[in-house]
Amino acid sequence: MKGEIAVRYTIRHFDLPLLTFEANMDSADTDLHIIKVYEENRSFLPLNLTVSEDGVERWLRHRTIPKNRAYVDALLSKVGLSLNRPLGIIAANKGLSLNDCFWVDAEGSGDTFEKVNLYDNRFSQVLAAIAFTGYGSSIRTSLASCPEFSTNGMLPKCWRRQNGKIYLYKGGTSRFSNLGFEPYSEMYAYQVAQVMGVNAIRYTLTKDLKKTLCSKCELFTSKEYSYIPIGQLVSKGGMKAIFEYYQTLGRTFVDALEDMLVFDAIICNTDRHYGNFGVLVDNKTNTIAAPAPLFDHGNSLFSLGGTDLWDNQKAFDEYARTLLPLAYDDFFAAAKSAMKPRHRAMLHKLLDFHFDRRATRYNLPPNRLKMIEKEVQRRARVLLW
C-alpha cells in the first residue's frame, strides 16, 4: 500500500470491537493488515472468520454483492462503485448485512450500531428499485441504507420494510419462454414442506413491486439470531464432512439435514448448494443455536422446464431424469441413505398430494401444475418402495 492512503477499520459485533485492520478500500490491491485483535472479545469474532489477513479479506468479500447478480452493474454504477473494488463497497455500506449483527466501522466515524443497523433503520427505496429492475438515476445517498449490497444470489431481488417486518422480494429469470417460473416454485415448494412437516420459509406471490410477479418471504434473522451458510463453516469434504460436522452439533441438526435431503429429492431441487442452508447463531452468546429453516427453492419443481413438456408425459419423464443435485451425486440415493422411520410418515402424506390453488391469485397453468403434482407423488413412491 505504498504511496496510498490507508484507513483503519474495526469489525464490530453490535458496538463491541473485535478486530482492527488497515486497508486502502479504493485500491485494486486488496492487501490489508491486521492491527489489533481484541482478545477480551475474541469469543464474539464471526464463526466464519479465520483470524489472518487472508481470512479477514475472504470474510469481507462474503459481505459484498455477488458478481452474477442481476443488474449488479447498474446498481453499482448508479452509486459510483465497482465490482473491481470490493473493499470499496464494504467501506461504503459499512459491511452491514441482514444475516447478522457484524459491521465494519471506519476510524473516527462516530457511528453506532443503533444508528446504522439494517434491522431498525430505513431502507433506500430508490436503491431497492434499481436493484430489482436495473433502472434508475444516479443518486447520492448513504449505502448503509441498502441491504441489497450484502445479499447473495443471482436473481433480481430487494428488501422492503412493511408494518414493522422486513420482506425479501425476488424475481425470476427472463429473456426466454421457459424462464421466469422461479417465484412459483418458491411458493409451491413451501406447500410441499408444509405437508411433510419440514422446517421451511413461507413464500407467497405478489405483483405489488413494479407489477412484476415475484416471490415474497419474511426475513428469518434478527438482532437475536443470525444466519451462517454451512459452506462458510465446512469448507471442504462435501456432504460427508457436513454430516460429520452436524453430528458434533447434536441430533436436531442431523435430523434437519436428513429432512433436507428427503425434501430436495421430492421437489427435485437442483440448486441446493453450500450457501443456501446452514445454521442460526444466538447473537447474545455467538454460539450455534439451531438449524436454519430451508429457503431458496426457485430451481425446484421443474421451474426451467420448456413449454413442450406439460402435455407430453414421455418428454417430461425424459427431462426429469436429466435433473441432478448440485452438491451430491443422486437425489434418491442420498435421500434413501438419510431416511428414518419419521420420513415414511412424511412421504405417505404425499401419495395423494395436490397443490393448494386457493393460496394465491397466481397459479401455474392447470396442465403444468397437474404434471408436477403427479411427479411429486411418484417421487414419494420411489422413496417408499
Go through the PLM ranges and name each one.
Residues 273, 278-280:
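Conserved protein-kinase catalytic-loop segment immediately C-terminal to the catalytic Asp
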